[in-house]
């Protein structure tokens, strides 16, 4: 993720669009008519918005239906390794409001917010904080949880009404039933 974040932060909008367009054209040629595009490799407000702009341009130029997900809580950026809660503050207080404003101007469809809740990424309290803020901004919720160990993320997703939960490899049965 670290290398991809660096490359994404350095890329201009044209580069983001062209690289993504090639992938989208290939998927469409193989029969995919709906594609989810996620941000999450910029991890700054500016680069996350750039990724959303690239997706919106692709949506306007290509016949595929695009579902768009803001994944600013994909990983803790290197510059926040010593204090991940500062990054959560950035996501909640700066990124989510900026993304909501962007959505209101550029994206008429549902905008999703996803969080990677896992040891080494975002803990349960951080995930709750981000998802609750996203919901306040009118975003539909998604969560990647319990890939390696159960932190209770699946239960949190159910509690908050997430539309999807991914990974769930280590999710206990009682949390799946929630």
Where are these regions (language model features)?
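Short intrinsically disordered, low-complexity coil segments enriched in acidic
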Residues: 1-5, 10, 160-162, 177-178
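Active-site-adjacent C-terminal substructures of enzyme catalytic domains
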Residues: 140-141, 150-178
């Amino acid at each position: 993720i670290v290398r991809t974040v660096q490359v994404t932060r350095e890329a201009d909008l044209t580069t983001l669009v062209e690289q993504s367009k090639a992938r989208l054209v290939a998927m469409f040629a193989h029969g995919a008519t709906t594609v989810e595009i996620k941000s999450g490799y910029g991890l700054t407000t500016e680069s996350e918005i750039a990724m959303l702009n690239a997706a919106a341009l692709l949506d306007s130029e290509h016949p595929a239906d695009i579902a768009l997900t803001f994944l600013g809580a994909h990983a803790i950026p290197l510059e926040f390794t010593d204090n991940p809660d500062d990054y959560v503050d950035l996501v909640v207080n700066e990124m989510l409001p900026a993304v909501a404003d962007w959505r209101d101007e550029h994206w008429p469809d549902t905008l999703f917010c996803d969080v990677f809740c896992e040891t080494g990424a975002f803990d349960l309290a951080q995930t709750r904080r981000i998802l609750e803020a996203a919901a306040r901004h009118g975003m539909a919720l998604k969560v990647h949880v319990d890939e390696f160990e159960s932190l209770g993320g699946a239960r949190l997703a159910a509690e908050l009404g997430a539309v999807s939960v991914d990974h769930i490899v280590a999710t206990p049965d009682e949390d799946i039933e929630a």
